Amino acid sequence: MKNKEREIIKIILRAYDHHLIDQAAKKIIDIVTKTGAQIEGPIPLPTKKEVFTVLRSPFVNKDSREQFERRTHKRLIQIVNPNNKTIESLMHINLPSAIDILLKK
């Protein structure tokens, strides 16, 4: 039996707006499928929720507080056996600046 090695590129997208991250994932998937590579995803990863508590008054009244939260949404896209055309098209993709992209091999 032959061991068929699969080369996988993992793309992790992070953003505060889930609509924006879904549009970016769709754009990446469209570009990669045009080059003939296989795709797994977008796989939704757990959303990170951060809560910040601040005092409302500048001096006294510690019982009066306000809470703010920030949610970071994540998506994972795996490109299986990419070719040179796939990598070249990923280098020239335009995505909004609100999206953080992490590439792993």
Swiss-Prot record:
GO terms for cellular component: ribonucleoprotein complex; ribosome. InterPro entries: Ribosomal_uS10, Ribosomal_uS10_CS, Ribosomal_uS10_dom, Ribosomal_uS10_dom_sf. One of its GO terms (biological process) is translation. GO terms for molecular function: structural constituent of ribosome; tRNA binding. It comes from the Bacteria. Keywords: Ribonucleoprotein, Ribosomal protein. SMART domains: Ribosomal_S10. Disulfide bonds: none annotated. Part of the 30S ribosomal subunit. Involved in the binding of tRNA to the ribosomes. Belongs to the universal ribosomal protein uS10 family. This is Small ribosomal subunit protein uS10. The gene is rpsJ.
